[in-house]
Structures are given as C-alpha cells and as structure tokens.
Amino acid sequence: GVYAEWIQANLAIPNAEYGKLAKAFNPVFFDAEEWVKLAKDCGMKYFVVTSKHHDGFAMFHSKVDKYNVVDATPFGRDVIGEIAEACYKHGLKMGLYYSQDLDWHHPDGGGYLSNHIPSQGVTWDNSWDFPDAANKNFDRCFNEKIYPQVEEILRNYGELCLIWFDMPMTLKEHQSRALFDAIKKYQPDCLINSRLGNGAYDYVSLGDNEIPDSMPENTEFDPAL
C-alpha cells in the first residue's frame, strides 16, 4: 500500500499508539452540506464515502465497536449520518465504502493466511500487534464485527445506492454470500461491487487507478480512482 490510509501498516504502528490520534480528532468546522453541495455542483450523481477502512475505525456511530468517530473522539458526531442527511436534503444518492476483510484493530482481522504474501514488505494483516497467525480465526472477526457493522450501515442511514467493498482476501464464500443477502434484504436496490469477493456482486470494480483501453463488453463496471 502506497496510500496515506495505509500508514499504520506501512510503519507498523501499534494500535495503542495509532488509537491516540482518535483522541485528537476534532474537525469542528466539518460541514457535510458543504461537501455534498460541492459534489452536486460538480455534476456528481452519487457520493461514496468511507464508513470503515482497513484500520478498523468507523466513521459512523457503531454499537458493535466503540472504536468509532462518536465514542472514541472529542468530535463526537456521526460523520456518515450527517453526510446521509445532507445527501437526502440535496437530492444526491449516497454509497458507502466498507472494508469487510482487512481490519487491523481486530485481533482476527483478515490477510494473515500463508498465501497472503506481503507487498513491498508490508503485511496485509496486523502482524505487529497480533503476530500469531496460526491462531487467528477470521470467523470471529466476521461474526463479532464485520457482519454486525454492515447491518448497522444498512439499517441506520437511509437508502444507499451502493456498498463498495474491498480486498476480499480471507472471506469464505458463505460469508460473502451472507453480506450480499443482507444487503438485498435491507436495501434491495443497493448495488454491490465485485470486491465483496467469491462471485457475489452486481457490477465489476477495476483495479486501483486502472483505466481500461476500451469499454469492457457485457458487464457494468467502475474504475477505482
């Protein structure tokens, strides 16, 4: 990972240290309406924002894990909730990114299997805090955090146009299918990208920063830019 959001993995920052940043996170001038109006003025039809990335920190008020923007920061406001309200007010569709496999805050977060070869020396899982890969069990992470949080975002933030998943490295087929089915249960019109994994998707997401030379035939797709 060469992106800013990968800094915890790139530098192997322990959760105890990385988590201190949350205690200093207080963007008091954050204005969801300003963001949404700018997006709409630029001609955007929908707005996708990160609800949880690989570091495991939720930008919504999660009852599943207190490592979230409401409970773990002095800011204390539900960012996703405010963006959702602004989107509905200004007629912009909203989608959410959610990291359903990698989670560096959970001891059993994905990316630890033997075939998950480090990229440029950076491991996919949190091997600096939780080095015992042999005893990791992604099922615990999925059941304790991933699935319940996906249910939260489906049930608590109104109509979503899509869920943008990422990095399906450890998910079993039945887990991908469980998430797919939950989305269709709570939000029948919500689209699901192919990075949910195991063939459970509505449309294809290309590789990061990949722009095809020509339009793929017979498939709906989006570039990950």
Predicted feature locations:
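Mature catalytic domains of secreted/periplasmic carbohydrate-active enzymes
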Residues: 1-225
